[in-house]
Amino acid sequence: MLRLMHPFSAQPNEGVGLYILWTVAVLFVIFKLLAPAKCDLPTVNGRRRFEIGQYQARRRFALDGRGIILNGLRKARAFRVVSQKGPKIILGPEFADEVKSHPACNADVFIAKEFHAHVSGFEVLRPQQVMKDAIRLKLTRSIGVLMKPMSAETALILETQWGNSDCWHELDLKSTIASLVSRVSAVMFVGEELGRDQKWLSIVTNYSSDMFVADLDLCKWPEALRPIATYFLSSCGKLRRHIREAALMLDPILSERYSAPHNKHNFLDWFEEVAGGRKYNPVLAQLSLAAAAIDTTSDLIIQTLTDICRFRDSGKLQQDLREEMVRVLRADGWEKSAMYNLKLLDSVLKETQRVKPVVVFGMGRYVTEQMTLHDGTVIPQGETINVVNTRVWDSAVYPNPLEWDPYRFVRRRDSGDHAAHLVSPTPDHMGFGLGKHSCPGRFFAATKIKILLCHILLKYDVKISDEASSTVVSSGNFLFPDATLSFCVRRRQDNLTIWG
């Protein structure tokens, strides 16, 4: 975590080969410094006097990315920043609708370039149409079938990991939620045998976290040298090892499934069904699913529980949530209609995602040909652009925007605002992106999160110690929950039989 938050604290020192690469890199940087800029947009955190290169500018962004972005928006609606991953063009939220549908804005190319998909160890992040089709055609349509298995798995995990003691006991919130999310996801993705295997869970969880560290390490190198540098960086070597170990575990299961008839509802079958003869790598696809499913889902659950516990009238809010859960689940059971009718829980989640989104800017796109925005701003071909998600803190859109109001979106929903649903992205709230490239798995993610929180809040009393103070941790473009909070739980005595 410390390396992720402070990626410039460690200097590359990983073998003689690195010295050769650094020599080439210095020459490359000199060439880049002498080359003319592609675009005349202002840079809001560029090099200061007597600084050579972008090291200090990148470091400043790592320490206060949100502040730099907000300061830039006060000066211009389109500008450059020097981020940990290099220069970026940042656009104000008024450009969101334009960017989401512009033919020159390519999301797949952006992802491939942004996350080094051509580099060994990062193949997991190559855009795969087969995976998108499996999510859209199979996963989303099968949510109703998966709800009871997800509920059963959640109950089993909580029984084992959180226990039945009616005395308050402390949990490491970050690790326990990550464990819960990764296992429930894995059982749905690869089945019970592999999904409950601790070694598999360790691989998929560690690949996701190690990828962020390796990404920042690799970004210290010029783009042209990254396919070589990856073989000299131990952080990148970890990714390749995770892929090899995942293949060793998954290949025998795939061979067995292909040779014997079965009737299962998970991605091992869905990938094969939707592929239609197209080539794909099931190991990379599974790691890609895990990377998408674990971190952001865990983040939202952790922050939501934190917000609930820190709310000024937490006792009443928890009671309101439990009453809604009991009423809805007794009426509907684990059906899709229940997820729709959990209106307060939906509002709580959307409000948490509003006050503390995962990122300050998103909607990354690669510009395939020169484009002119509605205000006349010209973006050259070959640039990467991002749109800020800062309307979530705009008082013109959300009254008292810095206040966490769990009932905010219930009121909006009751007044007829269809965009008040958690899974409905808009330029005012881009927690799941926007347009055709918005998160395709958001319906599954929202369902999974609600199931997990129903189990947690109906079965356990939760609190944060009185002396604890919650602080959102900012690192570059990312906003992380406070992982240092003391989170305590105890088993509730209500004997609710609503899990059928």
UniProtKB/Swiss-Prot annotation:
Keywords: Heme, Iron, Membrane, Metal-binding, Monooxygenase, Oxidoreductase, Transmembrane, Transmembrane helix. Heme binds at residue 439. Its cofactor is heme. CDD domains: CYP503A1-like. InterPro entries: Cyt_P450 (IPR001128), Cyt_P450_CS (IPR017972), Cyt_P450_E_grp-IV (IPR002403), Cyt_P450_sf (IPR036396). One of its GO terms (molecular function) is monooxygenase activity. Pathway: Secondary metabolite biosynthesis; terpenoid biosynthesis. GO terms for biological process: secondary metabolic process; terpenoid biosynthetic process. It is found in: Membrane. The chain crosses the membrane at residues 15-35. It is an enzyme of class 1 (oxidoreductase). One of its GO terms (cellular component) is membrane. Its EC number is 1.-.-.-. It is a single-pass membrane protein. Disruption phenotype: Eesults in loss of 7-hydroxydehydroaustin and accumulates a new product, 1,2-dihydro-dehydroaustin. Cytochrome P450 monooxygenase; part of the gene cluster that mediates the biosynthesis of calidodehydroaustin, a fungal meroterpenoid. The first step of the pathway is the synthesis of 3,5-dimethylorsellinic acid by the polyketide synthase ausA. 3,5-dimethylorsellinic acid is then prenylated by the polyprenyl transferase ausN. Further epoxidation by the FAD-dependent monooxygenase ausM and cyclization by the probable terpene cyclase ausL lead to the formation of protoaustinoid A. In A.calidoustus, the austinoid gene cluster lies on a contiguous DNA region, while clusters from E.nidulans and P.brasilianum are split in their respective genomes. Genetic rearrangements provoked variability among the clusters and E.nidulans produces the least number of austionoid derivatives with the end products austinol and dehydroaustinol, while P.brasilianum can produce until acetoxydehydroaustin, and A.calidoustus produces the highest number of identified derivatives. Belongs to the cytochrome P450 family. This is Cytochrome P450 monooxygenase ausR. The gene is ausR.
